[in-house]
Amino acid sequence: MKTVTALLLVSLAVVAIEGQHMKSQRCVCLGAGLNMVKPVLIEKIEILPSSPSCGHMEVIATLKNGAGKRCLNPKSKFTKKIIDKIEKNNRNAR
């Protein structure tokens, strides 16, 4: 009986550790994000689609000169125009 109890505790510990691993994969952006960033400051744009760990799309702008990353509001006009341009470029590249 003690062996079964010990195995059960070890199994629960493994499940708890695996469950915690999934919690670390959450949304990158906190809040809605910025409505606009000066286009000349943008080096790269990343679009992260919604997923089981984050229920909404995220748009992340990497800024030039090591100024960091900024989350953009996917619902803003500015961000929608950027997404449209990226999608258009992807279609033309095919």
Swiss-Prot record:
<dbReference type="InterPro" id="IPR039809">
    <property type="entry name" value="Chemokine_b/g/d"/>
</dbReference>
<dbReference type="GO" id="GO:0005615">
    <property type="term" value="C:extracellular space"/>
</dbReference>
<dbReference type="InterPro" id="IPR001811">
    <property type="entry name" value="Chemokine_IL8-like_dom"/>
</dbReference>
<dbReference type="GO" id="GO:0006952">
    <property type="term" value="P:defense response"/>
</dbReference>
<dbReference type="GO" id="GO:0006955">
    <property type="term" value="P:immune response"/>
</dbReference>
<keyword id="KW-0145">Chemotaxis</keyword>
<keyword id="KW-0732">Signal</keyword>
<keyword id="KW-0964">Secreted</keyword>
<protein>
    <recommendedName>
        <fullName>C-X-C motif chemokine 11-1</fullName>
    </recommendedName>
</protein>
<dbReference type="GO" id="GO:0008009">
    <property type="term" value="F:chemokine activity"/>
</dbReference>
<dbReference type="Pfam" id="PF00048">
    <property type="entry name" value="IL8"/>
</dbReference>
<comment type="similarity">
    <text>Belongs to the intercrine alpha (chemokine CxC) family.</text>
</comment>
<comment type="function">
    <text>Ligand for cxcr3.2. Chemotactic for macrophages.</text>
</comment>
<keyword id="KW-0202">Cytokine</keyword>
<feature type="signal peptide">
    <location>
        <begin position="1"/>
        <end position="19"/>
    </location>
</feature>
<dbReference type="InterPro" id="IPR036048">
    <property type="entry name" value="Interleukin_8-like_sf"/>
</dbReference>
<feature type="disulfide bond">
    <location>
        <begin position="27"/>
        <end position="54"/>
    </location>
</feature>
<dbReference type="InterPro" id="IPR001089">
    <property type="entry name" value="Chemokine_CXC"/>
</dbReference>
<feature type="disulfide bond">
    <location>
        <begin position="29"/>
        <end position="71"/>
    </location>
</feature>
<keyword id="KW-1015">Disulfide bond</keyword>
<dbReference type="GO" id="GO:0042056">
    <property type="term" value="F:chemoattractant activity"/>
</dbReference>
<dbReference type="InterPro" id="IPR033899">
    <property type="entry name" value="CXC_Chemokine_domain"/>
</dbReference>
